[in-house]
Amino acid sequence: MAAKERLDKLLCDRGWVESRARAQSLIMQGFFRVGGRVITKPGTRVPVDVEIEWVRPP
């Protein structure tokens, strides 16, 4: 089983955003799909090897 990490931290670690605060804002606005699902809670723990997509919110 893969290790899990907070989504906001994972986005920073992957270099997608410049800060955790920015990641949290974008996540709450619905900009990221994780494993095919839109996640809106920054503290959601996801596998570190999960596929993340940048999407336009509805």
Predicted regions and their residues:
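SAM-dependent Rossmann-like transferase core, predominantly class I methyltransferases
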Residues: 51-58
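A basic, amphipathic helix-loop patch mediating RNA/tRNA/ribosome contacts
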Residues: 1-48
